[in-house]
């Protein structure tokens, strides 16, 4: 098999394959030519060429999100790797595995006036789970076995119980384009520790006692579809003292759950003790609703258990008691194996009654519209969308409007809620559509978000299963509905940032 003449590059490619990474998004360049050649020549690797590095980063993110596996990114030296940073930070806060391969000059040439050269070492240090620096000038100073183990450790980190992005920066000398017949397999896999699936029973006994004696609120953030967790939560939601709140991006649906948090909290009396939980259980990633976050921070919650391996010290509600590094399905399955007692507190019933009233009021509210509004447009789109598709929601107003409507049965909801930026919504949705042609993928985007990421449309071949709906309101409509900017005289120019460009012209 033909490959790059550089042993270091061959070793890296073999290690990627050993850890199941077979898809690579390549951004064209010269310094990363040895990788481009090695990837292209390898029969087990599929490459996707994306010119704009910022778009490339989010396309890789969408692929990893859709497949549930690590995707590699590869770019040339200089500012190219900086353009990956928005996607890297999104992957970090979403716990999505990416392996960023940035080609570089050898360290001896950094900050000495050579072209297309910046300090790339540790460039992502605040938003990655691990990094490794390899330099062709220094490669022979360690054994092949040492390099194999270092790479294996890095790739394990990306795909551990707490997943996320890692960075491999590789200093390469010229010549860059030479090839050889590859004869050695450099792959080496290290043994992995299996994550725990259960709490020790004494710890679980304490939690069960608290469940039996308290008003319990379970809040689900952004998650992949999880039928097992949904089943276990359905069982818990049958108890009168347990309430389950979900958002569309939680991707679990059942009539026992409260799906539209902001709709339910509209007009909610936050001082009413009957609605305040004593025990808070959270799972998943980001929660869209600012109202529920503000409410829970001031609700006097006695204990908060955070379920999952990711970000164990993240104290969103300022009442964190303990992070439990189990998967949600394993944790709730163990809860249900124990004897829960249905206490007499009608906590669930009160919340559900509030939800039903809010839903009826919402119908009345929408029926009174006499002119076209963003909400009406969104409701019309919701009514027309078929089941069994992947619905991608761009950030700002779109993802918030979606939370005001009941989820469409069978639809999976996706959104870049790690950093909640508008910069990569189209590219992320496109990446998901590219690797899963069996599903229809629809993105709903505002005009500003769409224009910001319009280089995604440069990708070819463009997937036929990807549809894009742009809500054209000539600016950042979110600033008309959030407190503060709506009352500011600077709103139109500096916040809403009115613009006249039509997405149809792109």
Please tell me what each predicted stretch does.
Residues 3, 47, 148-153, 157-212:
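Conformationally flexible catalytic loops at phosphate/diphosphate-handling active centers
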Residues 1-3, 134, 296-397, 505-506:
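Phosphate/pyrophosphate-binding active-site segments
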């Amino acid at each position: 098999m033909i490959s790059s003449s550089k042993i270091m590059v061959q070793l890296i490619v073999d290690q990627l394959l050993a850890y199941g990474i077979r898809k690579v998004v390549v951004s064209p360049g010269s310094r990363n030519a040895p990788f481009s050649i090695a990837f292209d020549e390898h029969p087990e690797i599929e490459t996707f060429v994306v010119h704009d590095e910022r778009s490339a980063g989010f396309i890789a993110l969408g692929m990893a999100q859709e497949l549930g596996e690590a995707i590699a990114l590869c770019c040339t030296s200089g500012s190219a790797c900086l353009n990956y940073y928005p996607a890297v930070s999104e992957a970090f806060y979403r716990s999505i595995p990416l392996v960023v391969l940035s080609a570089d000059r050898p360290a001896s040439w950094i900050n000495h006036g050579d072209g297309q050269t910046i300090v790339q070492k540790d460039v992502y240090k605040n938003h990655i789970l691990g990094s490794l620096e390899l330099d062709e000038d220094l490669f022979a100073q360690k054994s092949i076995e040492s390099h194999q183990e270092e790479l294996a450790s890095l790739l394990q980190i990306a795909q551990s119980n707490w997943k996320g992005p890692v960075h491999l920066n590789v200093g390469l000398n010229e010549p860059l384009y030479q090839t050889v017949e590859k004869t050695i397999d450099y792959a080496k896999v290290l043994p992995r520790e299996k994550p725990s699936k259960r709490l020790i029973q004494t710890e679980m006994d304490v939690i069960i006692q608290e469940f039996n004696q308290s008003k319990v609120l379970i809040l689900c953030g952004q998650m992949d579809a999880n039928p097992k967790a949904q089943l276990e939560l359905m069982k818990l939601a049958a108890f009168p003292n347990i309430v389950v709140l979900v958002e569309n991006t939680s991707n679990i649906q059942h009539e026992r759950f409260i799906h539209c948090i902001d709709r339910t909290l509209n007009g909610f009396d936050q001082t009413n003790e009957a609605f305040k939980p004593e025990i808070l259980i959270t799972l998943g990633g980001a929660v869209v609703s600012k109202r529920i976050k503000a409410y829970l921070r001031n609700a006097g919650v006695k204990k908060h258990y955070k379920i999952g391996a990711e970000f164990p010290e993240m104290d969103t509600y300022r009442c964190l008691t303990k992070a439990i590094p189990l998967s949600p399905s394993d944790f709730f399955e163990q809860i249900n194996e124990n004897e829960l007692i249905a206490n007499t507190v009608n906590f669930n019933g009160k919340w559900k009654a509030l939800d039903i009233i809010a839903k009826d009021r919402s119908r009345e509210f929408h029926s009174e519209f006499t002119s076209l509004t963003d909400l009406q447009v969104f409701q019309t789109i919701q009514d027309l969308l078929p089941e069994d598709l992947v619905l991608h929601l761009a950030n700002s107003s779109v993802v918030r409007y979606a939370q005001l409507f009941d989820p469409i049965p069978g639809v999976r909801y996706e959104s870049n809620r790690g950093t909640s930026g508008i910069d990569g919504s189209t590219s992320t949705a496109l990446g998901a559509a590219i690797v899963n042609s069996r599903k229809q993928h629809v993105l709903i985007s505002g005009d500003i978000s769409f224009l910001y990421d319009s280089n995604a449309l440069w990708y070819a071949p463009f997937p036929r299963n990807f549809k894009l709906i742009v809500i054209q309101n000539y600016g950042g409509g979110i600033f008309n509905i959030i407190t503060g900017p709506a009352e500011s005289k600077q709103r139109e120019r500096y916040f809403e940032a009115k613009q006249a460009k039509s997405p149809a012209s792109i």
